[in-house]
């Protein structure tokens, strides 16, 4: 039995990640695919993260980074098991978000990556570009929904994309929604059909 593919959607806040994830979930047989999003706010760490994001509590940046990282590690075994059982996982945000947001606040990229080192490695990361309209919508109630900060996050994403050690697929914001939906579906289906070998380890 071939393993499942680990496919991650990344991008700035309000770039359409969840919408595109749901489009994929509707396009592929339900018994072969599952959806997972981070942070998972139902866990102990997730509830602490939710309190921070919604401005109910404050923590220093180092604690925040570790909380987000721990939240992903809580699901590392689940991700590994699902992939080995032939289930493809569509993941809305992953370690790349953690690193981009942490480094945008001044953390070391090397240190931030070290916290995530060893997590299951994605077979494909789809990065959704944001147009000016989406970027200007990044003003909201949660703590990171700020246009200036989101621009800093974007620069950190670009640094990771340029490293070339992960298979990134960048989706332009200029595509019409129906074209974007079909393009992403085809990219995901190809990734599922061509995945080979054991699950890798991220940044090892």
From Swiss-Prot:
SS bond list: none
Keywords: ATP-binding, Early protein, Kinase, Nucleotide biosynthesis, Nucleotide-binding, Transferase
GO biological process entries: dTDP biosynthetic process; dTTP biosynthetic process; dUDP biosynthetic process
Recorded GO MF terms: ATP binding; dTMP kinase activity; nucleoside diphosphate kinase activity
Entry keyword annotation includes Methyltransferase: no
Induction: Expressed in the early phase of the viral replicative cycle.
Catalytic activity from the UniProt record: dTMP + ATP = dTDP + ADP
Recorded metabolic or biological pathway in which this protein acts: Pyrimidine metabolism; dTTP biosynthesis
PROSITE patterns in the cross-refs: THYMIDYLATE_KINASE
Group of enzyme by EC: transferase
Range of residues in the leader sequence: none
Keyword check for Transferase: yes
Enzyme Commission code: 2.7.4.9
A Pfam family that the UniProt record links to this protein: Thymidylate_kin
Function: Poxvirus TMP kinase is able to phosphorylate dTMP, dUMP and also dGMP from any purine and pyrimidine nucleoside triphosphate. The large substrate specificity is explained by the presence of a canal connecting the edge of the dimer interface to the TMP base binding pocket, canal not found in the human homolog.
Cited NCBIfam families: DTMP_kinase (TIGR00041)
Protein family according to the UniProt entry: Belongs to the thymidylate kinase family.
Known partners and oligomeric status: Homodimer; the dimer arrangement is orthogonal and not antiparallel as in human enzyme.
Protein name: Thymidylate kinase
Gene: OPG178
């Amino acid at each position: 039995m071939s393993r499942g593919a680990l496919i991650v959607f990344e991008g700035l806040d309000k770039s359409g990640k969840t919408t595109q994830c749901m489009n994929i979930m509707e396009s592929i047989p339900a018994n072969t695919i599952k959806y997972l999003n981070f942070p998972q706010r139902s866990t102990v760490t997730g509830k602490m993260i939710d309190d921070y994001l919604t401005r109910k509590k404050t923590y220093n940046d180092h604690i925040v980074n570790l909380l987000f990282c721990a939240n992903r590690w809580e699901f590392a075994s689940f991700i590994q098991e699902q992939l080995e059982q032939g289930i493809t996982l569509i993941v809305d945000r992953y370690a790349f978000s953690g690193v981009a947001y942490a480094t945008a606040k001044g953390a070391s990229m090397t240190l931030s990556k070290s916290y995530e080192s060893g997590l299951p490695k994605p077979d494909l990361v789809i990065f959704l570009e944001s147009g000016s309209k989406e970027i200007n919508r990044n003003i909201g109630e949660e703590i990171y929904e700020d246009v200036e900060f989101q621009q800093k996050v974007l620069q950190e994403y670009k640094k990771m994309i340029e490293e070339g050690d992960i298979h990134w697929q960048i989706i332009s914001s200029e595509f019409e929604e129906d074209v974007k939906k079909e393009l992403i579906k085809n990219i995901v289906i190809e990734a599922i059909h061509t995945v080979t070998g054991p699950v890798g380890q991220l940044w090892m």
